[in-house]
């Protein structure tokens, strides 16, 4: 079954262009069906809405579907598509109809079969065929649905395979002639579908023709998951489909170039079924059948087509007109393309005879890179991604990823890293080489990559049966394969053995498995030379000669190898090692080696190796002398301190001899203030007007800074230093400008403010500096700014844009309020939203819909410039807003469709699953020093030892963990400078008392009552001082507890006398005044630095005080002896959760804490109306001592808990929703 149909269709495709039907959804919409129509009799009492479930109509309205099929066949269609676009179990879950998936697919195929057979009987000379449709599902296997967690997936490859397998079996059983995998927006979904289809074919002993059709989503020419047309083709070419095509998303005008490209590269027949143009403002398709037919006729005449049909907006009349347009037009002839290995990431990589040497990046390999191994072990995935990115930037055309290390879960690490790579276009644009000695790791990796990658590696060492089994699966996954020259006897060391093993493997793969020879890559084993063992001297020669043998005897196979192996004897002397690599590769490449696993950033050019060294290396590599190893060892020491490509540093002050404009640019880029006044004055004297110095060399220099920052070649601390230089230069010129009454032009005026109730502004300040560096005038209203003031100043100053910032969750509601007021008062300014607690989802769902003008979520300082320039550009603004609106609509749609990852439970069920603590067997520790303890003007020197520096670097957008960030190839040097500046400032803080650190803590008798905690006035426990209200996790936890903080305090009825602690600390007394002083001097760098340092001191104080409480004040861990790193990693007993954070997310609970400690009177810290702490550099929270206590996140709560909490707090529902919004709205 299947082969006969394929032969019939192929014969027709060579004679004429065949017609596929048109839009099924379009036709169904024309019937204007209501809910009861979708339900029919059978589903009249279904428990959820069914309107829109078009696939269900094959069961509830089968005659209607048959009518549509019949109309398309009458119009001239040759192939009917089954009405099963959303009929997988995954898509049917939207209607809770997963169990009906198989029945729907079977019924749909059966209906189409009946109609096709009726029409074939009418006109036997024109047989009609049924294509069983497998749609894309509503989930993506290579894209995270959560912008905050790019490694997360809401569907797995295996789940897709299972769903598609069930649908495929039913479609075949129902009578489908072909399988159509269509509207592919995520190629990994399609690879899972193809895997399922092929598996079912093998299972049932059938092989139907397969059609593949992808979707180019917009003018970028890429699928939604980011692939170009050719990359998409390469990824699925292994399916060997009857046809390859494109459908949906675009009309014929927009789709034409991609169909043309596909017709050029596809070895299969080419299909297309475009939409009837692009949707109009009402979502309708306007392209008439006649107009569409004109496009189709031109495509056909240009030789692009073998099959044509319609998608959204098309009707039987469109198909009728198309049939007339292509009648008599010669179909596209299949091209005779050269044999080549066609790989892909987001972009294609085709390796042909003429292709130069392919570099495979080796640094993302835990067995070969100590740094990468450390990053993966420490779960520093952002930095690990940077290693991959650097490999690609340095010229790697493929990256090899290996996680085989004894202390790692290699499979989990491989999946996590590959999923993260998928969200980084600079990395995922190249093909992936999945490298492991463990088959389960390789297979897990193949399930994560949408492109066509390479498996590294398989061999015959475990025998032929295992080798064949793995090879068949690799082919089904759609990957190329590296085959090691290794069999049951062992590794091939000699030239003869290398060819013998490779020839044996080649014949098995090509003749028995059917593996494409161009996808076979042999690694004939590169071994170290110059080891001092005579038997090793010819290893390089054996490899070089085996390359020529394999290329000669095994057509289309390629050669690769781990190049660094050859120089292993000289580890520690990188210069000599790279020279060996250069010489070795030179000779391998001459003999036909195609690719090599190398450090892409450390490849030396053969001709650049010093002649003396090159000759000695060639003697070793080519085994030309008996004493070659000794001669190379003799001269190797001369090169021990050299590095490939290093140059001598120029004189440090050579730039002082440059023209003044270049000196100003250099000072701005390097952040040098030493000569800026003198150089600015020299430029002023030589200028006609002082303003020319600003608008000329100074702005030219800042433009260079902006470009370098935008390209990632400068980092945020450097940009802030550049701004300091600029401000000093402008300050020198201002008196001269004022004397001449000149004023310069800016790119726009932007008002920035931290909203009412919030005191955090480091991020806002950084955005302001970056915008100033790009010639925007900034009006910074500071913190705690009421809505009325923001809008009043915006009008008075005639600003172009308003930017709002906030860190705590109540600030989100204040931002909504500002947006509503702007709408009410008919503002027409763009509104920017930023800050740690903000998100694109909240902006799209909660803010943007309250204001008709642009509302833009800006997630970092580097994006602010591009956003502002687009918003203020008459030319770019319309397209920017159109794209923004579409993006927000998508985000809202995702939010509305989002289902919780975990199943919710009732509050009663959650309470029944509280933390199980045997209170009878536990005696809570009695504090050594109960009551209040005040720490006034605390010693900063003591706190410095407790600083966690990693968040400090994150403040400056330098990602990396302290102290390893100093070794980072890109940001390490800047991090060291930043660290030095921070410590210099801390020295001043100590010497001059610039900042004051104050703190307070207290330990109080307490008992839990349900989810709450009663705190007593004294140890008699007769009078309740405060009740601490808590929330409980409310999701299903089959293997764990539903945590609540009260679980860690002994219940009142237990009779146990327990205690709870409270604390509040600040490192920021005086910080605001000092920052303002720096700003007044034009020194934004130190203004931001003092804020960042104060934040670190506050966190350090919290860490110090908690340690002191554990060891001395409470004293339950008197013998504790932890390093600062262990403190940061929370290796101690007990926790200190903070109100407003995940375990107790509701901010008003700071109120009882403030009252218990009398914080404002004792240490001068206060709370705003939104319960933000002032000074901003402050920390507060609770102390729990129980050894089982742990941190957790409350996440989403249900309505029953919302009402319970409101009742306990004495709130109405509106007030509860205000404070618990993030925990009830998602």
UniProtKB/Swiss-Prot annotation:
Zn(2+) binds at residues 248, 311-312. Pathway: Amino-acid biosynthesis; L-methionine biosynthesis via de novo pathway; L-methionine from L-homocysteine (MetH route): step 1/1. Methylcob(III)alamin binds at residues 695, 757-761, 805, 809, 861. Its cofactor is methylcob(III)alamin; Zn(2+). It comes from the Bacteria. Residues 6-326 form the Hcy-binding domain. InterPro entries: Cbl-bd_cap, Cobalamin-bd, Cobalamin-bd_sf, Dihydropteroate_synth-like_sf, HCY_dom, HCY_dom_sf, Met_Synthase/Corrinoid, Met_synthase_B12-bd. GO terms for molecular function: cobalamin binding; methionine synthase activity; zinc ion binding. Keywords: Amino-acid biosynthesis, Cobalamin, Cobalt, Metal-binding, Methionine biosynthesis, Methyltransferase, Repeat, S-adenosyl-L-methionine, Transferase, Zinc. Binds 1 zinc ion per subunit. Gene3D superfamilies: Cobalamin-binding domain, Cobalamin-dependent Methionine Synthase, domain 2, Dihydropteroate synthase-like, Homocysteine-binding-like domain, Methionine synthase domain, Vitamin B12-dependent methionine synthase, activation domain. Residues 898-1226 form the AdoMet activation domain. S-adenosyl-L-methionine binds at residues 948, 1136, 1191-1192. PROSITE patterns: ADOMET_ACTIVATION, B12_BINDING, B12_BINDING_NTER, HCY, PTERIN_BINDING. Residues 651-745 form the B12-binding N-terminal domain. It holds the Pfam family Pterin_bind. It catalyses: (6S)-5-methyl-5,6,7,8-tetrahydrofolate + L-homocysteine = (6S)-5,6,7,8-tetrahydrofolate + L-methionine. Its EC number is 2.1.1.13. Residues 357-618 form the Pterin-binding domain. One of its GO terms (cellular component) is cytosol. L-homocysteine is bound via the zinc atom. Catalyzes the transfer of a methyl group from methyl-cobalamin to homocysteine, yielding enzyme-bound cob(I)alamin and methionine. Subsequently, remethylates the cofactor using methyltetrahydrofolate. Modular enzyme with four functionally distinct domains. The isolated Hcy-binding domain catalyzes methyl transfer from free methylcobalamin to homocysteine. The Hcy-binding domain in association with the pterin-binding domain catalyzes the methylation of cob(I)alamin by methyltetrahydrofolate and the methylation of homocysteine. The B12-binding domain binds the cofactor. The AdoMet activation domain binds S-adenosyl-L-methionine. Under aerobic conditions cob(I)alamin can be converted to inactive cob(II)alamin. This is Methionine synthase. It comes from Vibrio parahaemolyticus serotype O3:K6 (strain RIMD 2210633). The gene is metH.
